[in-house]
Design a protein with these regions (language model features):
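Soluble extramembrane domains of integral membrane proteins
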Residues: 133-276
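Alpha-helical context
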Residues: 11-14, 18-21, 25-28, 32-35, ...
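Intrinsically disordered, low-complexity acidic Ser/Thr-rich regulatory segments
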Residues: 114-152, 308-329
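Transmembrane alpha-helical hairpins and terminal membrane-anchor modules
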Residues: 60-136
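Membrane-proximal, solvent-exposed terminal domains/tails of membrane-associated proteins
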Residues: 243-245, 256-576
Length: 576
């Protein structure tokens, strides 16, 4: 029987970290065996590559030293000849002969030794570079079959093998989105003004989740600066009583603040659960877990107690675990009874352990927003990670490096995603309550949602859809229409801005007692829209878990050949 996870930190340390390592190693070994990589031949080739690169670095260093010597000798020779010519009537003949002879010897040494050595070293470097390039091409050929076996779902399959009750969808379907709306009260207003860069949907303990990264434009402000230098003269009397003219200058500076489109990207975990259906709160990282003796902890504790005594603050009442209340701080919650049912003593204990640990996990680095049945976790540690899971990142010409990178990359992603779920796993009720659809069966409609369409458009890139005059990033929005042949035509609209140069004159008072117009160049932004289309086809064939990676690739090839499309990404073939 699969056990629930009530202490995600300890489960990661004692179970999942090592289990994922084993799964990743077994997955890579299976891929390598399937690809029939000649490991020894590749190891020999790579050793030759690295030796060649080291030799090239040594030759480059020697070339640098000989070039320095060459420059010094030529400068010395030229100076010597110049001295002999210019000072021929001033210096004794012996000195002139000594200087001239030294210059001649320098030139002879340059022509006989230095330049031939440089030529030889450059030739050796070029030959070695060609040899290394040929060896690298050979290494890529040796690894070609393995590099072809990586796919977009390799990490999610490994995660599902590692963590019980964690399932990933092939792609974010309309049914999954409809379930979030109907069962959990999801509101599509979240997507207004946002474009989905990527999304991974699925179930954990039978409840739906979406890991997504979005781009949003907000009109901010930018300050532009200009300056003007003014000059004037005054008449002054010096200490001797004489009148004189004094010149003055001053640089006047001015600024113009104008609207400026700013773009923000954010990665979130959105999770639906019917537990505590009326509860609303949001919390931000406090950094106070484990700092009970600090002045800030005591101050926050004082204010929370004061708020709890204030009847005007509604339903807020502190739990007996004051350390948890201060560190987790959800004093803006609207329903204390449901909060207490959700955050039991066991949940509080697990959450505090999670907040304190910065070694295995990430500590207190997440926002936790609950809006009735929708929970949103925004972890800081995922903001700099690209969780699109592009398989190109695994490709390498060196088998040993590929093996090392495969584990390290996936272990980093697994840790980041696992600890995004961890705040939810701390709550026992979230694992004890599942939707009726999960209990009594699932009838998943395999049509991709607009989230997936926007992610696909962003995968193809803004450049394909942006307006020719656009000078900013774009927010890509889509609309879809199913075609008679089963494919889908996606219309993409790229919302961006063009800019127009402006010149404003700002009056500034100068030291000469006059007002001056200081020019400031700035830009005014106007919205523009670009358009384009993507043809896509969803591969809805149920995947056999026993299928080999070669069989998966053959299936992908069949889909691309059948649909005449270019790219297969996460069970969707497409062409832009």
């Amino acid at each position: 029987m699969i056990q629930d996870i009530y202490d995600p930190l300890n489960e990661y340390i004692n179970t999942f970290r090592d289990k994922f390592k084993k799964v990743a190693e077994e997955t890579f070994d299976a891929l390598a065996q399937e690809a029939q990589v000649d490991v020894e031949a590749n190891r020999t080739t790579c050793q030759q590559i690295y030796k060649g690169e080291a030799d090239m670095a040594d030759i480059a260093s020697r070339i640098t030293r000989w070039k320095v010597l060459c420059v010094i000798l030529w400068i010395g020779a030229v100076i010597g000849f110049a001295v002999v010519y210019i000072k021929r009537n001033e210096f004794p003949m012996e000195q002139l002969l000594l200087i001239g002879g030294g210059s001649v010897l320098a030139v002879v040494f340059l022509l006989v030794k230095v330049h031939p050595t440089l030529k030889s070293l450059r030739s050796e470097r070029n030959d070695l570079a060609k040899k290394v390039d040929d060896l690298r091409n050979t290494a890529w050929e040796q690894m070609a079959e393995l590099n072809k076996l990586y796919d977009w779902d390799i990490l999610t399959r490994m995660m599902s093998k590692t963590v019980p009750r964690l399932e990933f969808d092939p792609y974010f379907t309309t049914q999954r989105l409809a379930d979030l709306r109907a069962t959990y009260g999801w509101n599509d207003s979240f997507n207004e003004g946002r474009s989905v860069l990527y999304s991974h949907s699925g179930l954990i303990n039978g409840n739906p989740f979406v890991i997504c990264r979005t781009r949003k434009m907000e009109m901010g402000q930018k300050t532009y600066y200009g300056e003007k230098t003014i000059y004037w003269t005054t008449r002054e009397t010096d200490s001797d009583g004489k009148s004189r003219t004094v010149s003055h200058s001053e640089t006047l500076r001015a600024s113009v603040t104008a609207p400026y489109p700013e773009y923000y990207e954010r990665t979130r975990l959105i999770y639906g659960n019917t537990a505590a259906p009326d509860l609303i709160f949001n919390r931000k990282p406090s950094g106070l877990a484990g700092k009970e003796g600090s002045l800030r902890f005591k101050w926050d504790k004082f204010w929370l107690k004061r708020k709890a005594r204030n009847l005007a603050d509604g339903d807020f009442a502190m739990l007996t675990n004051e350390e948890f209340e201060v560190a987790f701080n959800t004093s803006n919650r609207n329903n204390n009874q449901q909060f207490a049912l959700l955050f039991t003593p066991l949940a509080q204990q697990s959450m505090m352990a999670l907040l304190r640990d910065n070694t295995n996990g990430y500590g207190d680095d997440f926002n936790f927003d609950k809006n009735r049945m929708i929970n949103t976790i925004t972890p800081l540690h995922t903001q700099e990670l690209d969780l699109d899971m592009n398989p190109d990142q695994y490709c390498n010409f060196d088998f040993e490096r590929a093996k090392k990178d495969f584990y390290e990359i996936n272990a980093r992603y697994f840790r980041a995603i696992y600890f995004s779920f961890a705040p939810l796993l701390c709550v026992p009720m979230y694992q004890q309550i599942r939707s009726h659809k999960d209990i009594y069966g699932r009838d998943m409609e395999q049509r991709s949602s607009f989230w997936e369409h926007e992610a696909l458009a962003n995968f193809w890139g803004q450049e394909r859809f942006r307006h020719p005059d656009c000078v900013t990033q774009c927010v890509l929005k889509t609309s879809a229409k199913v075609q008679n042949d089963g494919s889908t035509m996606i219309d993409v609209t790229a919302h961006g801005f063009r800019s127009e140069p402006r010149l404003s004159y700002i009056s500034k008072f100068g030291g000469d007692g006059s007002w001056h117009d200081v020019p400031v160049n700035w830009y005014e932004y106007f919205s523009v829209e670009g358009n384009g289309q993507i043809t896509m086809y969803e591969d809805n064939q149920q995947e056999d878990t026993a299928m080999t990676q070669t069989q998966r690739l053959n299936r992908i090839g069949e889909v691309l050949e059948k649909t005449h499309l270019d790219v297969y990404r996460r069970h969707i073939a497409s062409k832009a």
